[in-house]
């Protein structure tokens, strides 16, 4: 297609909202002229289902709960006055608590002000807050955020080393809806131990974001933590960033949560439009459907040309893949849906995998994210009449053109700047697109049975570990994995036995010794003297 035809197609398919500055260009997606019209009936059905969801319908039937993350920025849309009041009260409490921390009326027991923030959470309880913190944070924020987002001991040690002697001025926020998530519990216990070793009383530094009556809620109440903020059962982890999960860490960091909520609210209004051509979330969902055949046939590569948006692809990985990656449709048919999401940032990726995107296997479509404003001030030229930001823009346009020359599809989202308002817009845009796409392909976007299966399997492994080590201690012998598995009456579990003991022997915690054999799997294990 020549440049004139491309320009005409660009003009025909460019979404632009003057109030927000949001733009969406779908012209480089190679859909046929009649595609949008052919999908209109399904799109209108998706709009209707979204309206029912926002009205309080049970959108997650296997869990019997509503899905109400849209109410978080428009409480007046909540199905009950009680929910609306709880949302408003929580946001106000967050503002007041953050102001008290910044003003010093809530401080460490010795009176020193809190200057660092440790957020303990995993999945949606970390990815959203991390994205917001990195996108909007500056060196002069009143609190500097750090994260325990895994149950990796070395990872937590590194974070504690970064905090260093400032632990006495560090406020810890533990985020878990149920309070039973093991990774978060482990992070909380590791943090508590670190405070204790420093001679500090952990409850006077701790805040909980959790469900009412949860295990974490009971712990925080009985121990006298500084504060507790709610997580409601109608907010899923991956869509919780505009709840206390994301707002409390952001407010403590000193970010403009009102601006973020306003941006999300504005985008929600845009994406409620029943006119498909004027609804950017619907256009996104339809482009996903076109690119993947509605069956996950292609991957989504997310390329934000802005360092502040580096973590957006990680955030979208969970939002999209955990929502859309489902074995069954809503009627119970096996469909194995999903869209794989990965990405880093431009123009870094010019020197990484863009080579394959242009010339390798064509199994993807690209989502470019463009930010018009380069920096807060003026830029000095790096060449006559050219700035570093001009180069960044040029690389985005050049990559888009180079991919198009090879028939590689892309769409481009443009925002005027990175700000609390535009970050809220991006979050809301993709939340809505995920929900609409799920309707188009007839799946439940709001549960995650595969995640639960993985948790149960991990629990089984840890239960076996206790039996394995107890058996070794009881026999006092040097045994192979096969011998231990047979003795436990589980000969088919020899691989689990071997891998469990391989890990145990590499660490001093369980007192296990390994005697390597020529064939590694024939190695013998025993208890250290």
Curated annotation (Swiss-Prot):
InterPro entries reported for this sequence: G6P_Isomerase (IPR001672), Phosphoglucose_isomerase_CS (IPR018189), SIS_dom_sf (IPR046348), SIS_PGI_1 (IPR035476), SIS_PGI_2 (IPR035482)
Subcellular location: Cytoplasm
Any one of the GO CC terms: cytosol
Record-listed E.C. numbers: 5.3.1.9
Record's keyword annotation contains Isomerase: yes
One annotated GO biological process: glycolytic process
Keyword Cytoplasm recorded: yes
Main location: cytoplasm
Top-level taxon of origin: Bacteria
Pathway where this protein functions: Carbohydrate biosynthesis; gluconeogenesis; Carbohydrate degradation; glycolysis; D-glyceraldehyde 3-phosphate and glycerone phosphate from D-glucose: step 2/4
Catalyzed reactions: alpha-D-glucose 6-phosphate = beta-D-fructose 6-phosphate
Active-site positions on this chain: 322, 351, 455
Gene3D superfamilies given in the database record: Glucose-6-phosphate isomerase like protein, domain 1 (3.40.50.10490)
Keywords: Cytoplasm, Gluconeogenesis, Glycolysis, Isomerase
GO molecular function, one term: carbohydrate derivative binding
Protein's UniProt name: Glucose-6-phosphate isomerase
Species this chain originates from: Geobacter metallireducens (strain ATCC 53774 / DSM 7210 / GS-15)
């Amino acid at each position: 297609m020549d440049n004139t035809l491309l320009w005409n197609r660009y003009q025909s398919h460019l979404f632009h909202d003057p109030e927000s500055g949001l733009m969406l260009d779908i012209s480089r997606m190679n859909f046929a002229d009649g595609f949008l019209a052919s999908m209109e009936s399904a799109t209108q059905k998706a709009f209707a289902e979204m309206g029912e969801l926002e009205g309080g319908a049970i959108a997650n039937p296997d869990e019997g709960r509503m899905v109400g993350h849209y109410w978080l920025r428009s409480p007046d849309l909540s199905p009950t006055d009680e929910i609306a009041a709880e949302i408003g009260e929580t946001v106000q409490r967050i503002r007041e608590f953050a102001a008290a921390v910044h003003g010093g009326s809530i401080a460490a027991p010795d009176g020193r002000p809190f200057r660092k923030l440790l957020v303990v959470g995993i999945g949606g309880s970390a990815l959203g807050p991390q994205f917001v913190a990195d996108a909007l944070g500056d060196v002069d924020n009143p609190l500097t955020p750090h994260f325990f987002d895994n149950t990796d001991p070395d990872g937590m040690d590194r974070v504690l080393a970064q905090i260093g002697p400032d632990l006495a001025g560090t406020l810890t926020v533990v985020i878990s809806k149920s309070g039973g998530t093991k990774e978060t519990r482990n992070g909380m216990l590791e943090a508590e131990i670190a405070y204790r070793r420093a001679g500090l009383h952990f409850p006077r530094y701790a805040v909980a974001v959790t469900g009412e009556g949860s295990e974490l809620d009971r712990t925080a109440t009985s121990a006298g933590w500084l504060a507790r903020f709610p997580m409601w059962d109608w907010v899923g982890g991956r869509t919780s960033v505009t709840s206390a999960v994301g707002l409390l860490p952001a407010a403590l960091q000193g970010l403009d949560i009102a601006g973020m909520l306003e941006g999300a609210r504005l985008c929600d209004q845009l994406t409620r439009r029943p006119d498909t051509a004027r609804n950017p979330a619907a256009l996104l969902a339809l482009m996903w459907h076109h690119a993947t055949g509605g069956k996950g046939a292609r991957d989504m590569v997310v390329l934000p040309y802005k360092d502040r948006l580096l973590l957006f692809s990680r955030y979208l990985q969970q939002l999209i893949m955990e929502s859309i990656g489902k074995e069954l449709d809503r009627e119970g048919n096996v469909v194995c849906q999903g869209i794989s999401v990965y990405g880093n940032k431009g123009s870094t990726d010019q020197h990484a995998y863009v080579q394959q995107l242009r010339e390798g296997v064509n199994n993807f479509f690209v989502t470019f994210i463009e930010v018009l404003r380069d920096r807060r001030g003026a830029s000095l030229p790096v060449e006559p009449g050219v700035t570093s930001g001009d180069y960044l823009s040029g690389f985005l346009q050049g990559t888009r053109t180079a991919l198009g020359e090879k028939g590689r599809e892309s769409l481009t989202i443009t925002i005027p700047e990175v700000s609390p308002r535009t970050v809220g817009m991006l979050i809301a845009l993709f939340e809505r697109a995920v929900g609409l796409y799920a309707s188009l392909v007839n799946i439940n976007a709001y549960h995650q049975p595969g995640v639960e299966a993985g948790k149960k399997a991990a629990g089984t492994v840890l239960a076996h570990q206790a039996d394995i080590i107890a058996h070794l201690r009881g026999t006092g012998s040097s045994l192979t994995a096969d011998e231990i598995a047979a003795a436990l009456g589980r000969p088919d579990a020899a691989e689990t036995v071997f891998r469990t003991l391989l890990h145990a022997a590499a660490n001093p915690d369980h007192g296990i010794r390994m005697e390597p054999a020529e064939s590694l799997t024939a190695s013998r294990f025993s208890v250290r003297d």
